[in-house]
């Protein structure tokens, strides 16, 4: 995994955990949890591409893998929509910077997951 991506995830998660949004902390905690799960999924998918044995095992459970991949893309789209929603509402520059960076990171991760998945298909 790219060390910049690791740093970006850690930085954004740390900053989000310190925020209090007007909507609710439950929404923010849900976003943080989904970011963490997305990072783990992206890491495991990248590692699967690197190991040919895992490639064979993924192909053998192809239908399940495709469903899981589809679900992750839905989660990414939801997170992107939430980041955009927060950006339209907030006037706090710290929150704006954090969620702009989160949005950029989500787009990068979506692209990486697409690349990995094409390599596995």
Swiss-Prot record:
Keyword terms, alphabetized: Host nucleus, Host-virus interaction, Transport, Virion
GO cellular component term of the entry, any: virion component
Biological process, per Gene Ontology: exit of virus from host cell nucleus through nuclear pore
Keyword Transport: yes
SUPFAM superfamilies tied to this protein: Nonstructural protein ns2, Nep, M1-binding domain (SSF101156)
Pfam family, one: Flu_NS2
Subcellular location(s) per record: Virion; Host nucleus
InterPro entries: Flu_NS2
Signal peptide segment: none
Domain of life from the UniProt record: Viruses
Function: Mediates the nuclear export of encapsidated genomic RNAs (ribonucleoproteins, RNPs). Acts as an adapter between viral RNPs complexes and the nuclear export machinery of the cell. Possesses no intrinsic RNA-binding activity, but includes a C-terminal M1-binding domain. This domain is believed to allow recognition of RNPs bound to the protein M1.
Oligomer and partners: Interacts with protein M1. May interact with host nucleoporin RAB/HRB and exportin XPO1/CRM1.
Descriptive protein name: Nuclear export protein
């Amino acid at each position: 995994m790219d060390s910049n991506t690791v740093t970006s995830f850690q930085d954004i998660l740390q900053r989000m955990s310190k925020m209090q949004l007007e909507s609710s902390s439950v929404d923010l905690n849900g976003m943080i949890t989904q970011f963490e799960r997305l990072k783990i999924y992206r890491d495991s998918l990248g590692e699967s591409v690197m190991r040919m044995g895992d490639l064979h095992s993924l192909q053998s459970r192809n239908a399940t893998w495709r469903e899981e991949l589809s679900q992750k893309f839905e989660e990414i789209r939801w997170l992107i929509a939430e980041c955009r929603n927060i950006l339209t509402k907030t006037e706090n520059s710290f929150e704006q910077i954090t969620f702009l960076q989160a949005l950029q990171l989500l787009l990068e991760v979506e692209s990486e997951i697409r690349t990995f998945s094409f390599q596995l298909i």
